[in-house]
Amino acid sequence: SSVASPDICVITNIGVAHLEFFKTREGIFREKTQMIQDMKNGGTIILNGDDDLLSQTAPIKGVSPIFFGMGDENSFYADHINPLGLKGTACTIYLPDDTSFECVVPLPGIHMVSNALAGAAVGCTLGLTPEEIKAGIEGLPSIAGRNNIIKTDRLIILDDCYNANPVSMKASIDVLDMAIGRKVAVLGDMGELGEHTGELHKEVGEYAAKKGIDL
């Protein structure tokens, strides 16, 4: 980030990926927020207000963060959330100027609504209109390895295999749970979890079992 000197800094969450190197979520928080220290003067900070650590972030370099999240205490938030299974999620998105619009986030999973809110915050910062932001959200393409739905004659495959961590793995299981029919989870290893590797893999397995995944 010191090379890029960003104009806009966005942090979507403080999970447990890279615990092997940073030991605690607080350590991950310190590392992720370092890019804000490298931000250009007068830049914009956009943070997930639903994250327990990010929501407590005080002004940095004299800049107060803009928060997005599901609750209406955030500057950018969503309600009337209606999951549409693997087709995505319908919702109403609210902007800071009391503007709102209905849209469908075309990628499955409630967590994708949060990501769309982050995008809306960036769009507003860059001067996009609500109509342009809505069009951008509804035109989101899927990419290989990230919540990508692949349909065959017999199967529907949810390809969410890139660089998984416990938070993303649980979100993917939630999406699988929305599907109709027999549900099979093929889960790989989660790396860089350090001394917490065993317990976190067990936690994800128990989560899948609780959700009623068939295999």
Across the structure, where does each feature detected by a protein language model lie?
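Acidic, Mg2+-coordinating active-site environments of NTP-dependent enzymes
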Residues: S5-I157, G181, E206-L215
